[in-house]
Curated annotation (Swiss-Prot):
GO terms for cellular component: cytosolic large ribosomal subunit. HAMAP family: Ribosomal_bL19. It comes from the Bacteria. The gene is rplS. One of its GO terms (biological process) is translation. Belongs to the bacterial ribosomal protein bL19 family. This is Large ribosomal subunit protein bL19. It holds the Pfam family Ribosomal_L19. One of its GO terms (molecular function) is structural constituent of ribosome. This protein is located at the 30S-50S ribosomal subunit interface and may play a role in the structure and function of the aminoacyl-tRNA binding site. Keywords: Ribonucleoprotein, Ribosomal protein.
Length: 113
């Protein structure tokens, strides 16, 4: 192991729940406005998870007032307070980019039993 691997190991978080594409999650993000810090919740469907180790990221998509909003988060970011898994989705793909074109009921994901 080289020095970078030791730094990466020290920066990894162990409080991240297991989630995968298709799951609906709440991401509690720390937002700094001026001198104040508050928690903002971003709720949506995980459409991708990529990378590994300290560089791992995931993308969450939601509809806000009829506009699709996607946000990419590093999994081990200190700006993430915590992550809650709301529902588990039953999908057959690792990348759910096709959800970008779907609207309404067609964009619904079946829930795992």
């Amino acid at each position: 192991m080289n020095r970078l691997d030791f730094v990466d190991q020290a920066s990894l978080r162990d409080d991240i729940p297991a989630f995968s594409p298709g799951d609906t999650i709440n991401v509690h993000v720390k937002v700094i406005e001026g001198a104040k810090e508050r928690i903002q919740v971003f709720k949506g469907v995980v459409i991708r998870r990529q990378g590994g180790g300290i560089r791992e990221t995931f993308t969450v998509r939601k509809e806000s007032y009829g506009v699709g909003v996607e946000r990419t988060f590093p999994v081990h970011s200190p700006n993430i307070d915590h992550i809650e898994v709301v529902t588990r989705g039953d999908v057959r793909r690792a990348k759910l980019y096709y959800l970008r074109e779907l609207r309404g009921k067609k964009a619904k994901i079946k829930e795992k039993r």
